[in-house]
Amino acid sequence: ERFRDADRRGQKDDAGAPTASDERSYGVFDLVALRHACAVNSADGIAITRLDTLAGLDTIRVCVAYENDGGSIVTVPESLAELEGYRAVTKSLDGWSESLGESRRYEELPGALHDFLGFVEDVTETPVEVISASPENRIVRRKIWTG
C-alpha cells in the first residue's frame, strides 16, 4: 500500500526544490528490514534523510512484522523467498504538519517526529544519530565521524 501526496503538486519541498508534478507515492517504512540491516552490519547509529517529504502526512505507517495465515514473524528470514505469501503488519504513527526547514536542533523538531524517531530507535535497538530534511539542513545528535 502507498500513501499519495497529490495536493503538493507545484509546491516546493523544504530543500527549496520543486515537488514532482505527479503524485508522490510513499511506501510503508519497513522497520523489520531496518532492524535486520542494523544487526547484520553492527550499526551503532542510523541516519534518516529526506524527512521533509513526510511533513504534512496525517499518519506514517511502519512495518513491525510480517504475517500470513500461519502466523507472524518479526525477523527477516534467511531467504527472502520465505516471505512469499506474507503481508506487512503495520502500525500507524502520528504525522506532523510543521516544516523542518528551519530546524537546526533536535529540540526544535515537532513532537510527533520525536515520537517517530523514538519508535524507530526502540524497534531497531539502534539510535538515530543523524536527522536530515535536506543536504543543507541536518541535525547530528552525536558525532559519530571523527577525523
Task: Report the location of each language-model feature.
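Non-transmembrane, aqueous-exposed alpha-helical and coiled segments at domain scale
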Residues: E1-G147
